[in-house]
Amino acid sequence: MKGSFTSSETRFIQQATLEYLKVRNNWTTQNADGEVVDRIIILLTDGAKKDNWSKDITTRMNRKTNQEESYQGLEQVLNDMELPCPVETISIPDGKSEEEMWTIFNVVYEALRINDELYFDLTHSFRYLPMLVLVLGNYAKFLKNVTVKHISYGNYEARDANTNEAPLMDILPLTMLQDWTFAAADLIQNGNIKKLQELKENNALVPLLRERGKKNIDRRLAEGYLDAYIDSLRNFLNDMKLCQGPNILSGVTINQIRDCHEQVSEAFEKVIAPIPPIISKIQKSLKDFETTDTMYPESLRNGYEAAKWCYDHQLYQQAVTILDENITTDFCQRLGTDEHVYKERTASNALLRWGVYREEDWEADTLEAVREKVQVAACSPDILNFIRLMQKDAVWIHNGCRNKYNHASMIQGTEGMLTPEDIEKLGRIIMRIVGRIR
């Protein structure tokens, strides 16, 4: 029994499960190339084969009455169902030792094919088999690109005393929650959103939502908000990987993430309570981008935090590029020059690197008012202090690291190739700068 579904009267959960999955209507024997598409695999210990499987079984001893009674083995029951696909049996050991456990693992794994869709029933299994199936499922997802579509358990102990009907429990949502957890961890640790996007595109929340039995409107809202949240995370990651300075400094994608986070958390509290903590964990990994610091405007803070985020996620070229450009933008804003005008930006950068105002850095067609303003500002305590703090690092970041990266260490005069020690130095500089603004 599952929701509105009730199987034929049967002693075998396998029959009930196959009826629930509508195997007779939806599964096939062969594809257009004559290859076997769908299969039913029954795992049999020697004892199970002898006592419950063989079609030659016609009677068995009733342990309660101690009398022999009519009995039909599962093999005959499945034959009578006239299933459209082959039924295969695989012998497995009793699973009484660690060695036998690994034998079962390997036997089941070898039976799987590339890109298989798996439907498991765990009812008559060893106590550790549910854990084995969870591990095996993830193992086969990685190595054979399989998809786990169904995991069920016939809970005979919870049967109705009057009707003798037992519930068929769908435990796939537990594995789906595991998938969402792993995908979120991959995003937080590696900056990789691919797994989250795949779950979104494959409607991987459907089993979870269906199991919770919530209103359709709640489901649609939750799914819609989650889709928007994942899209906003993807936009943020694209900004990092593609060094989209204007988006990073404006905080547009961070604000999108913040808005979507509030919506999706509220929606999922109503339908799947375990999801919001996963989302909150993602949100906490981006908390350093949220700032009201008065000395450093939020845009500049986000630039430095973006450099650190990229470094932490091993996007070193993006880290040094964003850091280099953000230092220049920071200096332009302090100096009063327009960071969006190439000549003013370049000349301001030269002032930072040389530490003094040089007339030759400011071309003749540069606005006189800008040049005069810079000459005055260059002597101010704020500018001199910024130069003192940043000059050495800024020169190394641009010449000693970024140029080597951008030119693949192929250009002469860049003092050799980029080394792991250079990357470590970059990390120390980023931490030092970020530490000053936090």
Descriptions of predicted regions:
Residues Y119-V135, G400:
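Elongated alpha-helical scaffolds
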Residues M1-E117, N138-R438:
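Long, low-complexity, Lys/Arg-enriched
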